[in-house]
A protein has these predicted regions:
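S-adenosyl-L-methionine
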Residues: 1-21, 36, 58-87
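Class I S-adenosyl-L-methionine
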Residues: 2-7, 82, 100-230
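Conserved class I S-adenosyl-L-methionine
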Residues: 21-30
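Conserved SAM-binding loop of SAM-dependent methyltransferases across substrates and taxa
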Residues: 31-44
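Conserved SAM-binding motif I beta-strand of class I
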Residues: 46-51
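Conserved SAM/SAH-binding beta-strand->alpha-helix loop
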Residues: 53-55
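Short SAM/SAH-binding signature in class I
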Residues: 89-96
């Protein structure tokens, strides 16, 4: 049984993709909840809790001290991955941000492309843009998952750099190829949510006398998944 608990199901599933023994960096740390869980339970030997703002770092420091892990978890005031190369992180978590921001953080740093580095990403929005940018920049999505937490379905994307440029269908970018292959209620509900939003957008196009064939095709595929996945 884990000594240190994590209340957030989203963070718990993200943590499950970490590799035992890997040095961790948590970018945009959430009160250091994830580093405390990983280090406190012996999954990671040490961790770096990072944030661009002082407030979250102050809260993180208090929680780290309360957990008696100040000798194994450090904090860092930084923008994205800037300035943490010397720490040598192997598993980098970037959770709870917009997909476009995550993409900017990942692609603007050479650290993310270093051999042996794994990225565990959880976009709140624009997961399709994040996947597209990863594939176009030589990253492989080695695993992914859908997780339901507080009546919302989140996407978790695990990526590693190998320099190979990849492509994917529109629906694979939106939902993830492995998630589609697995199926399940979470996939069905997420496809339904995306289809609803895209349907409103298509209706707006029609009212303006415009059409978007790519959007129409994606809408049909999302709707099909929403109606047929068990």
């Amino acid at each position: 049984m884990d000594k240190y608990k994590i209340a957030d199901r989203r963070l718990e599933v993200a943590a499950s993709f970490g590799r035992r023994g890997a040095r961790v960096a948590d970018i945009g740390t959430d009160h250091a909840s994830l580093p405390i869980y990983l280090v406190g339970n012996g999954i990671a030997p040490c961790a770096l809790a990072c944030d661009i703002n002082e407030g979250p770092l102050r809260a993180a420091k208090l929680n780290i001290a309360s957990a008696e892990l100040t000798d194994r978890i450090d904090t860092c005031l930084t923008d994205g991955l800037n300035g943490i190369d010397g720490y040598g992180p192997e598993d980098i978590y970037i959770l709870g941000m917009g997909g476009e921001l995550i993409s900017r953080i990942v692609l603007s740093s050479r650290l993310s492309k270093k051999e042996g580095v794994r990225l565990i990403l959880q976009p709140m929005t624009h997961a399709h843009d994040l996947r597209r940018d990863l594939f176009a920049s030589g990253f492989d999505i080695v695993d992914e998952a859908l997780v339901r937490d507080r009546d919302r379905v989140y996407q978790i994307i695990v990526a590693e750099y190998d320099g190979i440029i990849r492509t994917a269908t529109q629906v694979e970018l939106w939902l993830g190829k492995e998630n589609i292959e697995r199926g399940g209620a979470d996939l069905r509900d997420l496809a339904s949510l995306y289809a609803f939003g895209l349907g409103k957008k298509i209706k707006g196009y029609a009212e303006a006398g415009k059409t978007d064939e790519q959007a129409n095709e994606l809408f049909c595929e999302l709707k099909r998944l929403a109606e047929t996945v068990n």
